[in-house]
Amino acid sequence: MAVKIRLRRMGCKKAPFYRIVVADSRSPRDGRFIEEIGYYNPITEPAEVKINEEKASKWLQDGAQPTDVVKKLFTQAGLSK
């Protein structure tokens, strides 16, 4: 099973926020996920990012691949692979 760390869109139309989740790469963007490890709100100024570093590190060590946007968020938060 290929596991990805990616964003799951939440919120209203034109007012999105995102949850950072660990999911099977075959499931849909807003579908089934394994675990929630944080959130990202791009609407606030400055953008708000909260990541549970313990869970994120565990999943990265287990081989989960972050998407490009999540990789950028991890770098900004000081969490690198």
Swiss-Prot record:
<keyword id="KW-0687">Ribonucleoprotein</keyword>
<protein>
    <recommendedName>
        <fullName>Small ribosomal subunit protein bS16</fullName>
    </recommendedName>
</protein>
<dbReference type="Pfam" id="PF00886">
    <property type="entry name" value="Ribosomal_S16"/>
</dbReference>
<dbReference type="GO" id="GO:0003735">
    <property type="term" value="F:structural constituent of ribosome"/>
</dbReference>
<dbReference type="GO" id="GO:0015935">
    <property type="term" value="C:small ribosomal subunit"/>
</dbReference>
<dbReference type="InterPro" id="IPR000307">
    <property type="entry name" value="Ribosomal_bS16"/>
</dbReference>
<keyword id="KW-0689">Ribosomal protein</keyword>
<dbReference type="GO" id="GO:0005737">
    <property type="term" value="C:cytoplasm"/>
</dbReference>
<dbReference type="InterPro" id="IPR023803">
    <property type="entry name" value="Ribosomal_bS16_dom_sf"/>
</dbReference>
<comment type="similarity">
    <text>Belongs to the bacterial ribosomal protein bS16 family.</text>
</comment>
<dbReference type="GO" id="GO:0006412">
    <property type="term" value="P:translation"/>
</dbReference>
